[in-house]
Swiss-Prot record:
Residues 400-420 are annotated as: RuvC-II. Its cofactor is Mg(2+); Zn(2+). NCBIfam families: guided_TnpB, IS200/IS605 family accessory protein TnpB-like domain. The active site is at D225, E324, D401. Mg(2+) is required for dsDNA cleavage. Its EC number is 3.1.-.-. Residues 371-399 are annotated as: Target nucleic acid-binding (TNB). Zn(2+) binds at C372, C375, C391, C394. Belongs to a group of putative class 2 CRISPR-Cas systems, type V-U3, which lack the proteins involved in adaptation. This is CRISPR-associated endodeoxyribonuclease Cas12f1. InterPro entries: Cas12f1-like_TNB, RNA-guided_DNA_endo/Transpos. An asymmetric homodimer. Guide RNA is probably required for dimerization. It comes from Sulfoacidibacillus thermotolerans (Acidibacillus sulfuroxidans).
């Protein structure tokens, strides 16, 4: 199991902040170039492969065409001379990040459901695990030694060794760091990030450890239904217990922020024409800060929701969580579900569930809101409005979200539904 903890960089040891900041900014520029170029090459290879398949009846072998077994190798060969300041291992990790992301979303890109990934200015710097080490000094400071530069860049910048930095370690971060130093946790690929709003640099240390094992029953399943009025509804088949997370705070926050954003845009639109240049930048900055506020609220809320969900699954002894596959979320017809990042919430649930030893299964949600969780009858008329479910066949009546969550908690429910509607 891999987790991440963020440590603030206090200062570099062998450089002043101006020198260190210059190095990090230059590496950010090269990282951005590498990510975008690798994505471009992956896109071009996908297009070439598709045309080749149409003309020859089979996909090309990258070794024959590119001279490398995969796009990652070809991209590294193409990019390394232009992103020459980056440590070779870190550059390889950066290119892998771009090609892996492109591959993960290739189908969505082809369908037109999402645009080709692009990377902006303040992006993380990658560090492979071999290029980061941490130690505690006799006076108590924690030092992280980082291999950031290639040999030519070291000569160019007059840096003779690894760059060492003092990091702030306290609270839960101290426990994690002490376990890393004791060998209980292992450092894995990490990142350096910049918080533009605070103008601070952080070291995101990833660490690997064996998750605690709990006695959980795989046959006990929690079903999760995602909605609007109730953001998350949790139900089970082995117990009448139910839990829910109201969606009101999310919707209220979204409306407030959207209203504020529109107001800011109008103010910028009608501002005097003479207020150009830096004046425009000043007007845009609050809008950018609003975006940060939205992102922070989303991240915090989804962390809180996912923790509660997994905790309730453990409480009920569930070894399995089943939830909706939201790949085609737009087909659901809810604009709210599109606005709120349910994908991010699901990723956090999966992450925390796996950490607890819980299996996560995604199911096709079609008809789960129309099916009676008591008798299995499927009828669009069973759903009376947004909140009430009443079965036309057996008369079972319940909260509509609870009924859907109970259906989702049934093993192989999507297959059962597919058979029943044939």
């Amino acid at each position: 199991m891999i987790k991440v903890y963020r440590y603030e960089i206090v200062k570099p040891l062998d450089l002043d902040w101006k020198e260190f900041g210059t190095i990090l900014r230059q590496l950010q520029q090269e990282t951005r170039f590498a990510l975008n170029k690798a994505t471009q090459l992956a896109w071009e290879w996908m297009g070439f492969s598709s045309d080749y398949k149409d003309n020859h009846g089979e996909y090309p072998k990258s070794k024959d065409i590119l001279g490398y077994t995969n796009v990652h190798g070809y991209a590294y060969h193409t990019i390394k001379t232009k992103a020459y300041r980056l440590n070779s291992g870190n550059l390889s990790q950066t290119i892998k990040r771009a090609t892996d992301r492109f591959k993960a979303y290739q189908k969505e890109i082809l369908r037109g459901d999402m645009s080709i990934p692009s990377y902006k200015r303040d992006i993380p710097l990658d560090l492979i695990k071999e290029n980061i080490s941490v130690n505690r000094m006799n006076h108590g400071d924690y030092i992280a030694s980082l291999s950031l530069l290639s040999n030519p860049a070291k000569q160019e910048m007059n840096v003779k060794r690894k760059i060492s930095v003092i990091i702030i370690v306290r609270g839960a971060g101290k426990t994690i760091m002490d376990r890393i130093l004791s060998g209980e946790y292992q450092v894995s690929a990490s990142q350096i990030i910049h918080d533009d709003r605070k103008n601070k640099w952080y070291l995101n240390i990833s660490y690997d450890f064996e998750p605690q094992t709990r006695v959980l029953d795989l046959n006990k399943i929690m079903g999760i239904d995602l909605g609007v009025a109730v953001a998350v509804y949790m139900a089970f088949q082995h117990t009448p217990a139910r839990y829910k997370l109201e969606g009101g705070e999310i919707e209220n926050f979204r409306r407030q922020v959207e209203s504020r954003r529109i107001s800011m845009l109008r103010q910028g639109k009608y501002a005097g024409g003479a207020r150009g240049g830096h004046g425009r930048d000043k007007r845009i900055k609050p809008i950018e800060q609003l975006r940060d506020k939205i992102a922070n609220f989303r991240d915090t809320t989804n962390h809180r929701y996912s923790r509660y969900i997994v905790d309730m699954a453990i409480k009920e002894g569930c070894g399995t969580i089943q939830m909706e596959d939201l790949t085609n979320i737009r087909d659901i017809g809810s604009r709210f579900l599109q606005n709120w990042t349910y994908y991010d919430l699901q990723q956090k649930i999966i992450y925390k569930a796996e950490e607890a030893g819980i299996k996560v299964i995604k199911i096709d949600p079609q008809y789960t809101s129309q099916r009676c969780s008591e008798c299995g009858n499927i009828d669009s008329g069973n759903r009376i409005g947004q909140a009430i479910f009443k079965c036309r066949a057996c008369g079972y009546e319940a909260n509509a979200d609870y009924n859907a969550a109970r259906n989702i908690a049934i093993p192989n429910i999507d297959k059962i539904i597919a058979e029943s509607i044939k």
